[in-house]
Regions:
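Alpha-helix boundary/capping motif
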Residues: 4-6, 11-15, 20, 24-26, ...
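Flexible, acidic active-site loops/lids enriched in D/E/S/T/G that coordinate Mg2+ and/or position polar
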Residues: 29, 88-169, 175
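Oxyanion/phosphate-interacting regions
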Residues: 48-53, 60, 264-399
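Alpha/propeptide regions of enzymes that mature by internal proteolysis
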Residues: 63-66, 75-87, 91-97, 101-104, ...
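Solvent-exposed alpha-helices and their adjacent loops that cap or buttress functional pockets
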Residues: 100-101, 127-134, 142, 151-154, ...
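Short acidic loop-to-helix transition motifs that present clustered carboxylates
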Residues: 115-117, 236, 255-262
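Short glycine/serine/threonine-rich phosphate/pyrophosphate-binding segments
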Residues: 143-152, 156-160, 238, 259-263, ...
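Acidic beta-strand-loop-alpha-helix segment within the catalytic core
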Residues: 162, 166-253, 320, 347-354, ...
């Protein structure tokens, strides 16, 4: 190893930054025993700006990332064991445990559970220490997006959080949608910019997917047969599947996990061009937050599962919103939003948890709307010293 330098400020005396002698690797060692590997000049090194600055969003962002890391690690023990509820509980327990240590005044605005019905983190739940003077955050999260995938040992599962500091005059930056499902369409930045310039283009969740594919192919410089559409494999999406196949385009069907699927068309490392179909409404808000940071577009429209849900939405005052097309900015408003996720099993966005002897490796992404910086973080956790604080035990628990 080369020289070791202190990266700690007056109030941060727990970190050291070491410059490796080979391959341009930079090693950042935490007193907790975790090892974070940053390769070359990848911009993820800027994660450590929080050591030098007072920006509240920047200071706390790594703590949110640690929450998804812990959730991914703890739920990964249930990979392929056929118990998705246990995997979900493990992730929730780890996230709650991390939130208990965070000096924020947080409130869950998009969750997955109902109050008093574990394991989900319910809407309205207060998280953080709520210490005087601590920053307020609205929190949207999915402790495990892809619980079925985890239970079956399949790919495409992540733990993710979107957090926002509401801007002046805003009650909430992350829009709660009271429906179970939304019909969604997501596409890369090139397509989004083209639609902004010419709104008459048939780039709409209301348009036939065949028309969306044709115009997207022109904009992306591809043949229609080379356009890849990702679709959640559900009977309710059969009409989309049939259109894609009839047109001769490529189809990639997934069993679960439509947050990463909605973001896939905007990721440079995937060959997915479009995501279309009916998926979860809470997931639409999380993917909107991610796409606001990453670039790319999403449209979503409330999709009542049956007449009873439709009538309930009308009764609750949402009748005039049933035909509304929500864009990313409608679901994730303002510029004080961060998005982080950690892979549980491999997905288009992230690699999954890998345990090799005494080391667990996690892959995460951390993004902010304000800076538009996308940071990919590979963390090596020494299992001889690694602990996860769990809400259920209120203690640090060995992996």
């Amino acid at each position: 190893m080369g020289d070791t330098h202190s990266a700690a400020g007056k109030n941060h005396e727990y970190a050291t930054l070491s410059q490796g002698a080979s391959d341009g690797k930079i090693l950042f060692t935490w007193a907790s025993g975790n090892l974070l590997i940053l390769i070359g000049d990848i911009e993820v090194l800027l994660v450590y700006e929080f050591l030098m600055h007072k920006d509240e969003e920047r200071v706390i962002e790594l703590e949110f990332l640690r929450a998804t890391e812990n959730a991914a690690l703890h739920s990964s023990h249930w990979m392929g064991r056929g118990d998705k509820e246990a995997a979900d509980f493990a992730a929730c327990d780890a996230i709650r445990g991390m939130f208990d240590l965070m000096d924020i005044r947080g409130e869950i605005v998009i969750g997955e559970g109902i109050k008093d019905e574990a394991p989900g983190l319910f809407i309205g739940e207060k998280v953080g220490t709520w210490a005087e003077g601590s920053p307020r955050f609205d929190v949207a999260l999915d402790p495990v997006d892809g619980t079925t995938n985890v239970s079956k040992g399949m790919p495409n599962s992540i733990s993710c959080i979107a957090a926002a500091i509401p801007e002046d005059g805003e009650d909430c930056a992350l829009q709660e949608i009271p429906a179970f499902y939304m019909n969604k369409l997501s596409y890369p930045e090139v397509v989004r910019q083209a639609w902004i310039k010419d709104p008459s283009l048939p780039i709409s969740v209301d348009a036939p997917i065949s028309e969306v594919i044709k115009v997207s192919a022109k904009l992306l410089g591809k043949n229609v047969r080379d356009i890849t559409v990702m679709v959640l494999d559900r009977p309710r999406n059969e009409y989309i599947i049939e259109q894609v196949r009839s047109l001769g385009s490529k189809l990639r069907m997934i069993a679960d996990g439509d947050i990463t699927a909605a973001m896939a068309p905007s990721l440079p490392s995937t060959d997915v061009d479009l995501y279309a179909g009916i998926g979860g409404a809470p997931e639409a808000v999380l993917s909107a937050a991610g796409l606001r940071c990453l670039g790319g577009g999403q449209q979503a429209k409330i999709w009542p599962a049956d007449e009873a849900e439709k009538q309930q939405l009308i009764k609750d005052g949402w009748g005039d919103q049933l035909d509304r097309i929500y864009r990313s900015k409608d679901l994730a408003a303002g510029n004080n939003i961060l998005f982080c996720a950690t892979g549980i099993s491999a997905s288009p966005l992230l690699q999954g948890v890998h345990i090799d002897g005494k080391t667990a490796v996690t892959h995460s992404v951390l993004m902010r709307i304000k800076s538009k910086t996308v940071r990919f973080v590979e963390a090596h956790h020494d299992l001889r010293t690694k602990t996860i604080r769990l809400r259920s035990t209120k203690e640090e628990t060995r992996m």
